[in-house]
Amino acid sequence: TGEARTRYVDVTGTDKGYMADLRTRLWLSGQVSDDWRYVAMLENLQSFNTNKEESETKFRRAYVTGNAGDIKVTGGRYNYTVGQGNVFDDGIDGVQIDFGKVLKASMAYGRPAGGNDFHSFQDAGGNTIYTKNNDAFITTLDYKTGNFTFNAAFYDFLDYVGNADNKIWTVGGSIDIGDTVKLHGEYLKSNFAANTDGEDEGIVFGLNYKGAEPEKKGSYGIWAKYYNQDRSTYVSHTTDAVHDSLWGFDGYGVGFDYTITKNITALVEYFDFNGKNSEGKDKTWWSDVTFTF
């Protein structure tokens, strides 16, 4: 299986710029035994920002997953979206266990593939060099009853600032209203403040209506979300908004996706973010079309 996504992003404000690229992904999987399987994903990213049309191809996923009794085990390089993605949504080289039926829990230990911006610099070739360990321990709890889902998580990013860990606690939930509407929110708390104003908290809440389904022509979805997060409350945020220079952000995002025809889906998003501890401001227009096969 696979997908091809063509994307254009335009940013005005502090991080002014644009991105235009084509991302192609191919998924490979095989059964190792009755209980275990291997999964890999090969990704090619071709940038159209310059006349060079630069391209790179890498294995972005390579992991094994299976069951050991009542415990699900995953190990290798895989994508880990924790909770609502407001703290971490990125690739990780690690090991994860999931268990529980009514009250579900998970524990993971590994090294985020995206590194640690607090301990990084660009070398002469433009490569990101990380100067310290960026291992992390992440544990989660999820509980669903009726239309309500509760989730909580604890993150410990080691040696995140100097020799100190960044420890983040989150608690959140969602409510399904019928089959089409979902309200969701999350509170976040860190053990240190990244900005001089002393803030170390965050809150995110939003609404989703329906959602585009690639196999269902004419299906669509609408979402809106409000964000207010200190820089210490996220490591690799799930948002598509550009906010690199804001060092924490306060603002909103809205989006609309639509299935044009079977396996062809379009997405348009808009974000308006203010910097938490600066006069910086970013407005992001994101648009893409994804072909699945």
Map each language-model feature to its residues.
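Outer membrane beta-barrel
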Residues: E3, Y18-F121, N133-N151, S174, ...
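Outer-membrane beta-barrel pore domains
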Residues: R5-M19, T50-E54, N67-G69, K144-T149, ...
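Short, solvent-exposed loop/turn segments at conserved positions within beta-propeller repeat blades
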Residues: Y130-N134, A164
